[in-house]
A protein has these predicted regions:
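Bacterial N-terminal signal peptides that target proteins for export
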Residues: 1-8
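Bacterial N-terminal signal peptides
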Residues: 8-17
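N-proximal helix/coil linker or "cap" segments that precede and/or mark the start of modular domains
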Residues: 19-44
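Short loop/turn microsegments at loop-to-beta-strand junctions
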Residues: 42-43, 64, 145-147
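A short beta-strand-turn-helix
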Residues: 45-65
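Short active-site neighborhood of thiol/selenol oxidoreductases, capturing the structured segment around
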Residues: 58-79, 85
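Structural microenvironment flanking redox-active thiols in thiol-disulfide oxidoreductases
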Residues: 79-117, 128-133
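Thiol-/selenol-based redox modules, centered on thioredoxin-like
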Residues: 144-184
Length: 184
């Protein structure tokens, strides 16, 4: 009887130790997507903007490309970010940057948002999450996480911005684009 009780205690201890060992190692039951890594090629994606025009990312090589993901049209942070890009749009054009905003909102929502805030760049409708998935952008309750990707003229990912501050993001990207042009 004692040996049987000892065996049960020993078994429970061993099983409990396995569970503790898994937690101690930092393992999580569900890992999120991995963001596209610096050096990766531009994903081969096509999307429709707020005007119904088709855009192929693969056609965007030869000059810098910024793809920025945002959660939802016309929300405070997303509006601030989009308007900051709008306000420095001429500088993006002067540096030859192609810029795409991407969210899961549909084309009609993008059209309304772009018209209201006079956004001069394409907003790609990604209701299926295909772009989000290709870039490894986490999804939070049906909304893309705010993250941006800057590609160089060769179509290689040069910078990932996983923690975007809408108040400074546009200027930060312009600085990085200037450094790309100078080879830094």
């Amino acid at each position: 009887m004692v040996s049987r009780r000892f065996a049960v205690v020993l078994l429970c201890s061993a099983l409990g130790g396995i569970g503790c060992q898994g937690r101690a190692s930092g393992a999580t039951p569900k890992e999120g997507p991995m963001l596209l890594a610096v050096g990766a090629k531009v994903p081969n994606l096509t999307g429709t903007d707020q005007h119904g025009a088709e855009h192929r990312l693969a056609d965007s090589t030869g000059h810098p490309l910024l793809v920025y993901f945002y959660p939802k049209d016309a929300t405070p942070g997303c509006t601030k970010d989009a308007c900051a890009f709008r306000d420095v749009w001429k500088r993006f054009e002067q540096q030859g940057v192609t810029l795409y905003g991407v969210s899961r909102d549909d084309q009609a929502s993008h059209a309304k948002f772009a018209a209201k805030y006079q956004l001069p760049f394409p907003l790609i409708a990604d209701p299926s999450g295909a772009w989000e998935h290709a870039f490894g952008v986490p999804n939070n309750n049906g909304k893309s996480t705010r993250v941006s990707f800057l590609f160089d003229a060769r179509g290689r990912l040069a910078h990932v911005y996983p923690k975007v501050d809408p108040g400074v993001h546009a200027e930060q990207v312009l600085g990085d684009v200037a450094r790309l042009g100078s080879g830094q």
